Amino acid sequence: MRIGILTGGGDCPGLNAVIRAIVRTCDARYGSSVVGFQDGWRGLLENRRMQLCNDDRNDRLLAKGGTMLGTAHVHPDKLRAGLHQIKQTLDDNGIDVLIPIGGEGTLTAAHWLSQEDVPVVGVPKTIDNDIDCTDVTFGHDTALTVATEAIDRLHSTAESHQRVMLVEVMGRHAGWIALSSGLASGAHMTLIPEQPFDVEEVCCLVKRRFQRGDSHFICVVAEGAKPVPGSITLRQGGMDEFGHERFTGVAAQLGAEVEKRINKDVRVTVLGHVQRGGTPTAFDRVLATRFGVNAADASHAGEYGQMVSLRGQDIGRVPLEDAVRQLKLVPESRYDDAAAFFG
């Protein structure tokens, strides 16, 4: 058997660990070969590929961040228009099964391909942890660790200067990074996309802390956080070519409004892409490895149209159709639990 793999969408700590595990399992357990398509779906459309071998170079991938195959965003319309070319590329390279590793967009494309009779096994990847039907995705723990460490460091400087600090973290639709890093770092408030915020409530919480003699205030803000209607009007950034909203810096805009209303020194830190770069944590290396092994097993078992998934302590498989039906968002009850620590 000959397996094809690609990494799609944004990069993520643990991608190389998945690649390593697939290559090693296919070679050692099944005697199968693996071809990697470069730069995600673009490489599949353009037939740019490389042979992946179970050698010393493959072994060194475990702790390396990013993806050695490269990745890119490709518009779904371009994929649909290129269906014939995709099938031709797979046929020309003798690919029996394709393993796309990616987030919502990549897995949605994988599901579409499976409906077009392409043998596919999906591997979920996102630092946002918003893929449904899996308890967690690799990359999330690393991003959470980076965010928590950054907020830990901001506590001491905020306390020294009696400042209000707003920390913007990733999370377009789901606030898992913000919620967990806020709890782990002892932040005084967390704002997530699932729960619209009122700027006046933010200001009241800040004032209450300083009035009782506390020295500083840390608020974690997910990049996709939105105000309740009538609270504050954010600048509109329009949509990108994929139909995703362009963010215009919610933390900076909120910070300016808070500073104006309470006359306190407010500073904003945007963590940005540092959250998804660098060496994956031990948890992400292990999870990514287990996903890779299971994806290789599923491919050789003929279990196509599936996504590997973590449920409890076990790795299993779920239909791609179920996994891409909706995003996994933060439940209101989880936010309520965190809110007990606000202030």
Curated annotation (Swiss-Prot):
GO terms for biological process: canonical glycolysis; fructose 1,6-bisphosphate metabolic process; fructose 6-phosphate metabolic process. Its EC number is 2.7.1.11. InterPro entries: ATP_PFK, ATP_PFK_prok-type, Phosphofructokinase_CS, Phosphofructokinase_dom, Phosphofructokinase_III, PKF_sf. Belongs to the phosphofructokinase type A (PFKA) family. Mixed-substrate PFK group III subfamily. Its cofactor is Mg(2+). ATP binds at G10, G103, E104, G105, T106. Homodimer or homotetramer. This is ATP-dependent 6-phosphofructokinase. Its main location: cytoplasm. Mg(2+) binds at E104. NCBIfam families: PFK_mixed, PRK03202.1. The keyword Oxidoreductase does not apply.
